[in-house]
Regions:
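Intrinsic-disorder/low-complexity, polar/charged segments enriched in Ser/Thr/Lys/Arg/Asp/Glu/Gln
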Residues: 2-8, 45, 60, 73, ...
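Beta-strand/loop substructures that line and gate deep hydrophobic ligand-binding cavities in soluble
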Residues: 85-133
Length: 152
């Protein structure tokens, strides 16, 4: 059975802004990556670059958005960093990230993040553990980013 990453994080912003932090290049570059090239539509690119001078490594080059509904959810393919590239980036299908947004209070949004597609061997277990930490830290970073400047 697959070991899905499931994370939940409440952040201090409205639903619209939370969604934009996953779909707008300038906002993605404020918390998740150095360079973003995202086209927020089904089959649009979802390419993030942590080293823009070496786009083939430590990036999601070639990844696509698989589903999107404004202020509700976004799903996209995902690749691994250089240490996992030899198996993650050639897997068919690639791993897959789904992010749902909900809000029951003004200026408070809950993000539900699921990362699926993990295979069952030790390399994949290491990659899965890496990404569980990475996504958790990224969501904490997003909350800290919002705390710095509550009005964007």
């Amino acid at each position: 059975m697959e070991d899905i990453i499931q994370l939940r994080k409440e952040i201090d912003c409205d639903l619209s802004l939370a969604f934009k932090f996953f779909t707008q290049n300038d906002l993605l570059e404020q918390w998740l990556t150095v360079k973003a090239e995202v086209n927020p539509e089904v089959r649009g690119q979802f390419e993030l670059f942590w080293d823009p001078d070496d786009k083939e490594n430590n990036s999601t080059i070639g990844c696509k958005i698989t589903g999107i509904e404004n202020e509700r959810y976004i799903s996209f393919e995902w690749k691994g960093p250089v240490q996992f590239k030899h198996f993650m980036n050639s897997a068919d299908p690639l791993t897959h990230v789904i992010v749902f947004f909900s809000s029951d209070k003004p200026n408070r949004t809950t993000i539900h993040l699921f990362h699926t597609g993990w295979r069952q061997n030790s390399e994949w277990h290491d990659a899965r553990d890496y990404f569980e930490r990475a996504w958790s830290n990224a969501l904490i970073g997003l909350q800290k980013r919002l705390a710095k400047n509550a009005t964007l």
